[in-house]
From Swiss-Prot:
Catalysed reactions, semicolon-separated: 7-aminomethyl-7-carbaguanosine(34) in tRNA + S-adenosyl-L-methionine = epoxyqueuosine(34) in tRNA + adenine + L-methionine + 2 H(+)
Protein name stated in the entry: S-adenosylmethionine:tRNA ribosyltransferase-isomerase
Name of encoding gene: queA
NCBIfam families: PRK00147.1, queA
Organism superkingdom: Bacteria
Enzyme class name: transferase
Keywords attached to this entry: Cytoplasm, Queuosine biosynthesis, S-adenosyl-L-methionine, Transferase
The species this protein was found in: Gluconacetobacter diazotrophicus (strain ATCC 49037 / DSM 5601 / CCUG 37298 / CIP 103539 / LMG 7603 / PAl5)
Listed PANTHER family: S-ADENOSYLMETHIONINE:TRNA RIBOSYLTRANSFERASE-ISOMERASE
Biological processes per GO annotation: queuosine biosynthetic process; tRNA wobble guanine modification
Subcellular localization(s) per the UniProt record: Cytoplasm
SUPFAM superfamilies assigned: QueA-like (SSF111337)
Statement: the UniProt record of this protein carries the keyword Cytoplasm: yes
Taxonomic classification: Bacteria, Pseudomonadati, Pseudomonadota, Alphaproteobacteria, Acetobacterales
Length: 355
């Protein structure tokens, strides 16, 4: 099994990087990738016909915050990207010019009366901040001072637009705290959810607050040396019960996005039973991983050399995904956060019945 990041590289024409989402959202293309046999070119609104009655869709209900902040330490300008809230109410953040910061420094934010104290700093650009406000007042501060942290491949020379605030939110959004959107969820519309209901496909949600580390590349060529950033996740007892009941009844667990899959796998017992979860996960799924919780994955098309491309190769098979991505490029599928989607059926392991 390969341990080299370069083995997960591929050529992607820049013209295939989506700058805006499909409208309506469920008109995006969907590449159906069964465990074996030919690929099928569909659209997202075909999803109900590709699933079975009794299957359970599991979506991430995190909501994106405007996480980029323009801070000052005296006259020095410090760019801050909030990453995740910590149990004590402080925030871990990534900081440009972080080496200028020391514990005890106080940051100000132009145009607001708010401040943040620097609690600590690491050697990788990370800082821990304690803001002078919390709760609804902190949310109001972010709405006034923060900017969406759109992925760097979405070109916005003058910054994210008000339309991006709408486009970069999923229909499932309920719990604020993510830096980046769980982009597979961007394809869902009220009409699509109604069609899934009519087809007998169940639905539940979990929460994984996607952190700023999602944009970080694998440095070097050794996959084994890569360390994921921790992200906060919650699976309620109600959601765990629904997933376990669906599996007992013979339904498949369909993860909407890699974030849902990663949290489900983090919360799964060896036999696939899902336990309630409330904590951090830094799970890194790559070829060789044995899946316990998820049977089908709906996800967008990911970056070369990224941990997410490694994840889908682990899920559906390395050669299978190389072929699928080659098909997608040749057929003009749109890539990344605002792009098209694919539906992956997990590659069976030895002794396992077909899914």
């Amino acid at each position: 099994m390969t341990d080299l990041a370069s083995d997960f590289d591929f050529d992607l024409p820049p013209a295939l990087i989506a700058e805006h989402p499909a409208r309506p959202r469920d008109s995006a293309r969907l590449l159906d990738i069964p465990a074996a046999g030919p690929f099928h070119d569909r659209i997202v609104r075909d999803l109900p016909s590709l699933l079975r009655p009794g299957d359970l869709l599991v979506a991430n209900d995190t909501a994106v915050i405007p996480a980029q902040l323009d801070a000052r330490r005296g006259e020095a300008r410090i760019g801050i990207t909030l990453d995740r809230i910590l149990p004590d109410g402080t925030w871990h953040a990534l900081a440009r010019n972080a080496r200028r910061l020391r514990a005890g420094d106080v940051l100000t934010f132009p145009g607001t009366p708010n401040t943040a104290a620097v609690i600590s700093r690491d050697d990788e650009g990370g800082v821990v901040l304690r803001f002078d406000t919390e709760g609804a007042a902190f949310d109001a501060f972010l709405q006034a001072a923060g900017v969406l942290a759109l992925p760097p491949y979405i070109a916005r020379p003058f910054g994210p637009t008000e339309q991006d605030r709408v486009d970069y939110a999923t229909i499932f959004s309920a719990h604020r705290g993510a830096v980046a959107a769980p982009t597979a969820g961007l394809h869902f519309t009220p009409d699509l959810l109604a069609a899934l209901d009519a087809a007998g496909v169940g639905r539940c949600t979990l929460t994984l607050h996607v952190g700023a580390g999602t944009f970080l590349p694998v440095r070097g060529d050794s996959i084994a040396a890569h360390r994921m950033h921790a992200e906060r996740g919650v699976i309620t007892a109600e959601t765990a019960d629904a997933i376990n009941a669906a599996r007992r009844a013979g339904g498949r667990i369909v993860a909407v996005g890699t974030t849902s899959l990663r949290l489900l796998e983090s919360a799964a017992d060896p036999d696939g039973t899902i336990r309630p979860f409330d904590g951090d996960t830094a799970i890194f799924i790559r070829p060789g991983y044995r899946f316990r919780a998820v049977d089908v994955l709906m996800t967008n098309f990911h970056l070369p050399r990224s941990t997410l491309f490694m994840l889908v190769c682990a899920f559906a098979g390395y050669d299978r995904m190389r072929d699928a991505y080659a098909h997608a490029v040749a057929d003009g599928y749109r890539f990344y956060s605002y792009g098209d989607a694919c539906l992956l059926h997990r590659a069976p392991v030895a002794g396992e019945q077909g899914l």
